[in-house]
């Protein structure tokens, strides 16, 4: 299902481009923390190449996240699933504030491109799992 795809934290790197690793680093029974490492290449100054996210899950409905450490000034967002049966709609919102301020045209273009690529990868993986 879509929910299982977006919360498959330990396998996200298997289907999201440029994500080197993603793993739960918190202990069972504590608030969920996920460390993600990406290969941002030349754009590491825009997108964090390492971040630890605090996850807040509302199973089957929404997943909120915020950076608690890493190479980013601020990062937060949400995945939201609307609909109980197919077709469902997946919404994604994120606010990323890089450590290094850049011209908006540069950072906005790159972030939009990265988000689109990752969003499409999640959608493709969810569809693959439903077959």
Model-predicted regions and their roles:
Residues 1-29:
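Hydrophobic ligand-binding cavity/cleft-lining segments
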Residues 1-4, 110, 114, 118:
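Short amphipathic alpha-helical segments
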Residues 1-4, 36, 46, 88, ...:
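Short intrinsically disordered, low-complexity coil segments enriched in acidic
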Residues 2-5, 12, 55, 92, ...:
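Hydrophobic pocket/interface hotspot
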Residues 15, 44-45, 74, 104:
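Alpha-helix N-cap/helix-start motif
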Residues 23-71, 120-131:
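Glycine-rich portal/gate segments that line the openings of hydrophobic small-molecule binding cavities
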Residues 67-115:
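Beta-strand/loop substructures that line and gate deep hydrophobic ligand-binding cavities in soluble
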């Amino acid at each position: 299902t879509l929910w299982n795809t977006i919360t498959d934290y330990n396998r996200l790197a298997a289907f999201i481009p440029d994500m080197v690793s993603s793993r739960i680093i918190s202990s069972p029974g504590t608030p969920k923390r996920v460390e993600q490492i990406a290969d941002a290449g030349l754009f590491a100054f825009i997108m964090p190449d390492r971040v630890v996210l605090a996850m807040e899950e509302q199973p089957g409905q929404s997943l909120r996240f915020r950076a608690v450490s890493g190479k980013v000034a601020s990062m937060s967002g949400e995945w939201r699933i609307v609909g109980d049966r197919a077709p469902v709609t997946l919404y994604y919102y994120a606010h990323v504030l890089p450590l290094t301020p850049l011209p908006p045209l540069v950072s906005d273009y790159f972030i939009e491109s990265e988000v689109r690529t990752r969003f499409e990868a999640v959608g493709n993986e969810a569809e693959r799992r439903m077959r």
